[in-house]
């Protein structure tokens, strides 16, 4: 009988601490914030489950909580602003030049920043663009999300795009908005935070949050860039074929077929760290962003620049 040796869960082995569960995560964050008055930024990538995160971080017992969603421009303004990039075409669009500053209402932003400056105790700035709203934060937590999981959540109509309410839209339109607008905007800020975030979070499995230090994240990316590695493959049904992959890749035999296999697309695939036996997931794009020269070489970076 054929036995597949295909590794569906490749990972970089690491040693370090992983905080699991909301109680442990909140306790660690509170213990790291020793000052009487401090600002904690919780920056979120598009596609996170905000209801779960808000409930989970309630355990911080913040004295002042600012949700960046309340500072965004109205939905209709954001739709109008992003239309030239998203367009009406089902497939084609244009890569945006927008950044987070274009999404915020200037008056609300100024009021929020003044509130942050005058607040006492623990102030939490949560949501998309939180690190831009509070650039002088005492501690930065980044809640990441890989694009394959974003696509799965889009298919289940669980998430909205940046500043819009489009859960009911088809997954292809979600993907298009993400590709041309949302992910571009999120990645601009992420590139700045990869080198300085204090903590990094994996919430890809709902109800099972995990957190590591930013130092451990950067150590893992450096290690991965200097050794052979694989990104995490994913598979998807399609109208054609797919029986061969079931057998060779040890896939779910109950699915009708598998027509797609993505095994090296950094923009869409995940990267795993195996930290003392605990799997920690992130977008493999993080490696490309943080270790561009080490990963691709000097000539490639010099010719094409940062991704």
Model regions: which residues?
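ATP-dependent NMP and nucleoside kinases share a basic, alpha-helical "lid"
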Residues: 60, 110-163
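Short hydrophobic/aromatic beta-strand immediately N-terminal to the Walker A/P-loop
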Residues: 39-43
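Short, intrinsically disordered, charge-balanced linker/junction segments flanking boundaries
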Residues: 299-307
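ATP-binding Walker
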Residues: 47-48
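ATP-dependent small-molecule kinase phosphotransfer cores
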Residues: 2-20, 63-122
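Extended, regular secondary-structure scaffolds
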Residues: 146, 151-156, 163-186
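NTP-dependent small-molecule kinase module
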Residues: 1-35, 51-56, 60-61, 156-159, ...
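Catalytic cores of nucleic-acid editing and processing enzymes
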Residues: 35, 59-63, 111-115, 128-130, ...
